[in-house]
Amino acid sequence: MGRKVTVATCALNQWALDFEGNLQRILKSIEIAKNRGARYRLGPELEICGYGCWDHYYESDTLLHSFQVLAALLESPVTQDIICDVGMPVMHRNVRYNCRVIFLSRKILLIRPKMALANEGNYRELRWFTPWSRSRHTEEYLLPRMIQDLTKQETAPFGDAVLATWDTCIGSEICEELWTPHSPHIDMGLDGVEIITNASGSHHVLRKANTRVDLVTMATSKNGGIYLLANQKGCDGDRLYYDGCAMIAMNGSVFAQGSQFSLDDVEVLTATLDLEDVRSYRAEISSRNLAASRASPYPRVKVDFALSCHEDLLAPVSEPIEWKYHSPEEEISLGPACWLWDFLRRSQQGGFLLPLSGGVDSAATACLVYSMCCQVCKSVRSGNQEVLADVRTIVNQISYTPQDPRDLCGHILTTCYMASKNSSQETCTRARELAQQIGSHHISLNIDPAVKAVTGIFSLVTGKSPLFAAHGGSSRENLALQNVQARIRMVLAYLFAQLSLWSRGIRGGLLVLGSANVDESLLGYLTKYDCSSADINPIGGISKTDLRAFVQFCIERFQLTALQSIISAPVTAELEPLADGQVSQTDEEDMGMTYAELSVYGKLRKVAKMGPYSMFCKLLGMWRHVCTPRQVADKVKWFFTKHSMNRHKMTTLTPAYHAENYSPEDNRFDLRPFLYNTSWPWQFRCIENQVLQLERAAPQSLDGVD
């Protein structure tokens, strides 16, 4: 009997409800796996329908079309003589489950339902699915007639079981189950399962990749075994970017690593591994073997098939590798860029329009589009015909081939500097120079006539003319005049997005890009329905601190020297009158806090789940060397006052790339009221009482320094 097995896992760029495209990508991955000698192919979670179907899971159509795709897979000659493990929703006894359907040569071997559902952060699986709660139990599932006709089976095993082939034993866990305190792979490994598979639908978060890798390597380090992880990749229809990172590990080491960010729709990993390495590794772990001797057995589905060959002694085996991680700046450069590409090609639009202000945020967004163009050109040079076909569709030129990123950027990105009498010459110059370096089609215009027309209507109706504070107006007048400028920019952005290509004799429209960062959204430091209102926002989940580091990275990686003056300039909205031609307004002065402080507040509020009093107590220790308790209290109260006053703005926030775990995104991730008692009387009184106690107890030690 052979001892070496070749197994395959993959990362697929599936699209919610794109059953035709999803089927073709699944078939392509199986074909690649077979051509590389694999006898087992694992695919991502819910790959048949696409993970992000959300409330479409309620529809019987989604179940029907998933089984139709399964029938097409069973019928295809590509799926013969290889165990195929695919993901789809299945209804059993009127209960909907998130399942793996494992089949071999037109026979369904096992339908394995997910036992631990993801229901935190962006995940809402309990809304659509029920976890299978009967450990080590199977039932007979009555197959649809379209499947019966192909498999000649009336039923198939449904439940928590493992596959026993001639030469090994294979068990399955699904995404979230790896993250639970008592993952199924533990008990399966103790029961002699040698190959564990994990089909995931895991999305990108900055600095998260190491957690996923650590979980897999630790699982196989403690218990031995081979571990395959598959994942979806790309944007499948909303704010999330699924970041691939398919992998194959054994006995605590990684043997194959998939890309985290890629424009390839299908990526297949294979490895040839020796089962005897698993057995000898386990044999010397006495604590593991004692536990295994008492382990409860899993139901075994016998499979008349082997993953190994009889004559495999000379077959080379895969060698362990070191996992290569991206820096946070590289993650920002690549993740949102790939997300933008998927959104652009699947929206059937002709490119992007970006209001380019000459500041860090819009410059970072421009850099992401340029990074996207770099990735596209790289894929085209490597021979990716699908990417080239998408490029030609977008620019509406059947023979076009991008020569370099600047060339492509000129075809798909229009940047627009919208000046007013409050704009400085410096920001105009910075925007123009950056546009020249990245190659975008750049427009400069002046919004003053539109502002004058709108405020003129108000004056005509009311007989009142509002003034800026610098000219003697009240704070209410000052804010209203700032907001008029910001909102007119949004109207003009959409006008130019719809008609700028038409004016140049080019078909199609443009997607409007927003540039509000996660910190500004958290505080509400933006005008509702201004240029933060757009079609999509690639930086809306990224902190100001990370964006500044990313812009510095772009200076070096892409030689965009125009960014140097942008990153060194004061951060300002330029909505108030200039003082002697110079900026008189800065963001941090307007906010009453620094961006660094704002990031801290955001992480404590969302990630650490703190209200005002808990945050105050936490920051007393964190900032004890720089702030007195009174100063900490004032800062915390100011943050929560501003956050709650502006919480309503989150309900209309532009869909943004999800990158940070403290995002205030209202759609699914951060669910809170938008009408608050903004004075927080009870909470702030608790803070005030604590400050008074501290001041009475040790006034001399509360100076904020050592």
Swiss-Prot record:
Keywords on this record? ATP-binding, Ligase, NAD, Nucleotide-binding
The record's listing under CDD domains reads: GAT_Gln-NAD-synth, NAD_synthase
For the region Ligase, give the residue spans.
325-706
Q: Which residues bind ATP?
A: P355, L356, S357, G358, G359, V360, D361, S362
- What does the entry give for GO biological process? 'de novo' NAD biosynthetic process from L-tryptophan
Q: What is its EC number?
A: 6.3.5.1
The biological pathway it contributes to is: Cofactor biosynthesis; NAD(+) biosynthesis; NAD(+) from deamido-NAD(+) (L-Gln route): step 1/1
Substrates-to-products reaction catalysed: deamido-NAD(+) + L-glutamine + ATP + H2O = L-glutamate + AMP + diphosphate + NAD(+) + H(+)
Complexes and interactors: Homohexamer.
The UniProt entry's sequence similarity note says: In the C-terminal section; belongs to the NAD synthetase family.
Q: What is this protein called?
A: Glutamine-dependent NAD(+) synthetase
Query: Native species of this protein?
Result: Macaca fascicularis
